[in-house]
Amino acid sequence: MAEIKIGTSSFSSRDWVGPFYPEGMQPREFLKFYAQHFETVEVDATYYRIPSKSMIQGWNNNTPEDFIISAKFPRSIVHAGEKATPDAEKVLDPDHTYGDRDAFLQNISGLGKRLGTLVLQFPYFSKKHFTDAGPFLEKLDRFLSDLPDGFKYGVEIRNRNWLKKDYAELLRSYKVALVIADQAWMPHGDEIEKKFDPVTSDHIYIRLIGDRKEIESITKTWEKEVIDRSERLDRWADMLARAAKRQIDSLVYVNNHYAGHAPETARRLSRRITEILRNS
């Protein structure tokens, strides 16, 4: 049977002290404890800065060898703009991004066997950035063609109308994962499956992000689930179980903004998948 590894997006939430981390636990102890309960984590610190070698060594020291750490490419590559507005001219541009790309890959490779998928997480692009998907896909094609071998890559876009077969075929040609994001305006994975096969590499990569505006109108702390995502989680579990039966591995990461408390949501999804596979 294929492997389904489920974890959270980041492990550093202080709101988890009590409901997940033991009372009194210090942040420097979080990852070691986390790795005793989950098999994988997605770190977002790499989006904001290229990780130092000492940071990488710290992750290695606090996790077992079979633990998987996925990471985001730096913001300078996928966003490239000042403040909230992306710079479409600089995004993926060799002159502006390849230096950071190389520095990022050199340092992140220090994870060795622990290294999971490296994700190009793009923001939503308006028509003033790209008139349609075509110019973006041209830039993406060139960037992917220049990526070095020896790593697993994934791409996440947040333009719903760009999720089409030609996008999937481009990723498939490079064996790059199509990252499926359960996010405010993006379709569920099973909706994508009705249009085309979203499996473009040797594994599926799913990010359960949620609706930031919706959940922050309810809470801004992350010690418990406050939104019932049972219906969507059941659909994700069905999709992941189907992939496992096709011998396709999966990585799934849950954000606090999805339901309110990522560790519990991740465990809930894991239990549901186990039930489905046991009864199938």
Q: Which residues make up each language-model segment?
A:
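Residues lining hydrophobic/aromatic ligand-binding pockets adjacent to catalytic sites
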Residues: M1-S280
